[in-house]
Curated annotation (Swiss-Prot):
Keywords: Cell outer membrane, Ion transport, Membrane, Nickel, Nickel transport, Receptor, Signal, TonB box, Transmembrane, Transmembrane beta strand, Transport, Zinc, Zinc transport. Residues 174-708 form the TBDR beta-barrel domain. This is Metal-pseudopaline receptor CntO. Induction: Is part of the operon cntOLMI that is negatively regulated by zinc level through the Zur repressor, which leads to transcriptional activation of this operon under zinc depletion. One of its GO terms (molecular function) is signaling receptor activity. Residues 1-21 form the signal peptide. Belongs to the TonB-dependent receptor family. Disruption phenotype: Deletion mutant does not show growth defect in LB medium, but it exhibits an evident growth defect after treatment with airway mucus secretions (AMS). Disruption of the gene alters the intracellular zinc content in VB-MM medium supplemented with zinc. Mutation severely affect the ability of P.aeruginosa to cause acute lung and systemic infections in C57BL/6 mice. Mutant shows a small decrease in the extracellular content of pseudopaline and is partially impaired in nickel accumulation. The keyword Zinc applies. Residues 63-169 form the TBDR plug domain. Transports the metallophore pseudopaline, which is involved in the acquisition of nickel and zinc, and thus enables bacterial growth inside the host, where metal access is limited. Is probably involved in the import of pseudopaline-metal complexes. It comes from Pseudomonas aeruginosa (strain UCBPP-PA14).
Length: 708
């Protein structure tokens, strides 16, 4: 698939033709994206950097200052200022979120919140990471919300550190079009189009289309990729009490699979950041995803309403890759494994919520009673060579490409089916102007069937396992509004996550269980222009899978881990012209029990200290009127580079980015972004010493934005 920036440019110019936009006002009079704080909705746009409402923490439209739990919101404006194509960059400003395995650069397969790694993230409250979905594209995202602490009482299976929920762009009442085209270092080209229009005079029928086209060679040798995204959405106000929203997204992604660089003898920095250890003639991995989502809302009366929503996604991934396997004793001979993957998955989720808003005497209750059903199918085929038999080696100092492909010696075929049902109960309680509480519980029933066929050394081995797990995950929280500017809160909650597979006796493993405790303060500063949340936390997780010392080759649920610390996040307007967003986290995360890893070992990719700050200044006078300029600083401390307590570490780093925008006309803006200004050599993440992802060198992006 070869995609061209001219495709979206052509569509954008066509959509801006006088015939199509004959009914619009002049561009100078259209201020369509300005949204006041009073009009903000939990799923809508945010003015500036500070969000006031969220639905991620309660599945209801609630003021953030009334939620007795830490939640960070990174709004669309941050993504626009950074000119970021992926949402991972936004997570740097959430506080306590770090990067983990990205599956060769293809996905947001895993990330880390408050010390614990998770593969769960959500899209409008639906699980979005079943299978191997492409890394989320920023073109469709209105805001990125990070709920800190266990979220199983709302979302079901997950990890105790926290959860990311992506809120997508919805059709708006105003008519507008935004065309954005950028070009940058390493022949990186990207164009997006955001087109919104009412379809009738009354504004009951609204339509929005988001398009993105991307073509990039990247700073890594031979590791280029292309992406095409089409995301239409449609809303219909059927009557004053009933609305329907339908959203779809189609993504076509082709990218070279890249496990990154290596660390000879556990030392980094001796190799060029650009050096690639795969094979240029392997081709690209194709990852095609389709998502369809529909939400029907109906107000029964002034107190009660219904929400029925369904979400379906499908994905297919296939392609060849030569991947880093292990380093020989000499430290420069890299054994490699040649793989072919063919994965396909389907996931469907349906939710039915009954929401109530009523009083018992002087006490207000916002009630949520919800049912959820999910069915998931996943089929995986992996063919791989065997490095111990065919090393397929390459010299990391002077790589010579074009070796004959080794034969496949192992054939893995896996089939997984999951049926999950859940009941949610929640009560948001407003006792008076000072005190608020939150009670919630979720009852989950999870059934998993797995079948695996493995051909190894010419012999087939078939295995199957089945497990049914039930879990009740409660949550309780309280908030005291000491003054209009200061709110104190505390909460406790539980999480669970099923463990796949069976032990030596063929018995399904007990699920991982997590507990979280949090206390903090929420501040409303500078007459409401700046919001801040400071929270301390203590998290535990048990039933972590670890090797069974009595039965080599098998596992048992004997592992435990603990994470504790505090994090800070703030955002808003320091002055009318200066917007800020920033975060800091101190995280002490370690293994507390394991059969193979020493107690006290640090958890993978978790820095003890991390922080970020971005500020943008808007000019209001003179020849710079309408322009802005800003900078972003990101610090990440030392991290364990693998999970085996080998002593391999990723060094700390600090990066500085610059940005500026200048209005060429009333509807045209020129932008420039310089990332990693001082060209620091750094490493974003690793899995071990042969899977290490280097960060981007200094790079420049120029952009042009047209608004109609």
């Amino acid at each position: 698939m070869r995609v061209s920036v001219s495709l979206v440019l052509g569509v954008g110019l066509g959509c801006s033709s006088p015939a199509l936009w004959a009914e619009t006002e002049s561009p100078a009079e259209l201020e369509v994206l300005t949204v006041t704080a009073e009009a903000e909705r939990a799923e809508g746009p945010v003015q500036g950097y500070r969000a006031n409402r969220s639905a991620s923490a309660t599945r209801t439209d609630t003021r953030i200052e009334d939620i007795p739990q830490a939640i960070s919101v990174v709004p669309r404006q941050v993504l626009d200022d950074l000119d970021s194509a992926r949402i991972e960059r936004a997570l740097d400003f959430a506080g306590g979120v770090s990067r983990q395995n990205n599956f060769g650069g293809l996905t947001m397969f895993e990330y880390n919140v408050r010390g614990f790694t998770t593969s769960e993230f959500y899209r409008d409250g639906f699980s979005a990471n079943r299978g191997y979905m492409n890394a989320p594209d920023s073109a469709t995202i209105e805001r990125v919300e990070i709920l800190k602490g266990p979220a199983s009482s709302l979302y079901g299976r997950g990890d105790p550190g926290g959860t990311v929920n992506l809120v997508t762009k919805k059709p708006q009442a105003e008519r507008f079009a935004r065309l954005h085209a950028s070009a940058g270092s390493w022949d990186r080209y990207r164009s997006t189009l955001d087109l919104n229009t009412p379809l009738d005079e009354e504004g009951d029928l609204l339509y929005r289309m988001n398009l993105a086209v991307e073509d990039s060679k990247g700073f890594r040798d031979y590791a280029d990729g292309q992406r095409l995204l089409v995301a239409p959405s449609f809303s219909w106000q059927l009557d004053p009490d009933t609305s329907l929203l339908v959203e779809a997204e189609v993504v076509r992604n082709r990218q070279v699979f890249d496990r990154g660089t290596v660390a000879p003898h556990n030392h980094l920095g001796s190799l060029p950041r650009s050096r690639f250890f795969g094979e240029p003639d392997d081709g690209k991995i194709d990852n095609n995803n389709e998502t369809l989502q529909a939400t029907l809302r109906h107000h029964l009366n002034e107190q009660w309403s219904l929400r029925l929503a369904s979400h379906y996604k499908h994905g297919h991934l296939d392609g060849y890759a030569s991947e880093n396997s292990s380093l020989a004793a000499d430290g420069y001979t890299l054994r490699r494994e040649y793989r072919y993957r063919d994965f396909e998955w389907h996931d469907s989720i349906t939710q039915l919520d009954l929401l109530g808003d009523l009083h018992t005497g002087s006490i207000r209750h916002q009630l949520l009673m919800g049912l959820e059903y999910e069915r998931y199918h996943n089929d995986e085929l992996i063919l791989r060579s065997i490095p111990s038999r065919n090393p397929y080696a390459i010299d990391i100092r002077r790589p010579v490409y074009g070796q004959p492909k080794p034969p496949f010696g192992r054939d893995d075929r896996n089939h997984e089916e999951v049926d999950a049902m859940a009941l949610n109960l929640q009560d948001q309680i407003e006792f008076n102007e000072k005190w608020r509480g939150l009670l919630g519980v979720r009852f989950d029933r999870y059934r998993q069937d797995m079948n695996a066929t493995r051909l190894n050394n010419g012999r087939f081995r078939d295995t199957s396992s089945q497990q049914t797990q039930r879990a009740a995950t409660p949550r309780i929280g309280v908030l005291y509004q000491a003054t209009p500017e200061v709110g104190l809160f505390a909460n406790a909650s539980k999480s669970f996550k099923p463990n796949g597979g069976t032990d030596m006796a063929g018995k399904a493993f007990d699920p991982e269980e997590g507990r979280g405790y949090e206390a903090g303060v929420k501040l409303d500063l500078l007459d409401g222009r700046l919001g801040m949340t400071l929270a301390a936390f203590h998290l535990k997780k048990k039933n972590v899978l670890t090797a069974d010392p009595s039965n080599p080759g098998y596992q048992q649920t004997a592992g435990e881990a603990r994470s504790q610390g505090f994090d800070l996040q703030f955002s808003g307007q320091l002055t009318e012209q200066l917007r800020l967003i920033g975060a800091y986290a101190y995280i002490d995360a370690e293994v507390t029990k394991d059969e193979n890893i020493a107690r006290g070992s640090r958890l993978l990719n978790v820095p003890k200290h991390s922080g970020s700050l971005m500020g943008v200044y808007e000019f209001r006078e003179g020849w710079l009127h309408g322009a802005d300029a800003g900078a972003a600083v990101n610090y990440v401390g030392e991290r364990a580079g693998d999970s085996s307590d080998s002593g391999f570490e990723l060094p700390a780093y600090t990066t500085v980015d610059l940005l500026a925008h200048y209005p060429l006309a009333s509807n045209a803006t020129l932008g420039v972004n310089v990332n990693n200004l001082f060209d620091r050599r750094y490493y974003e993440r690793s899995y071990n010493n042969v899977w290490v992802a280097p960060g981007e060198p200094r790079n420049l992006t120029m952009s042009l934005t047209l608004n109609y």
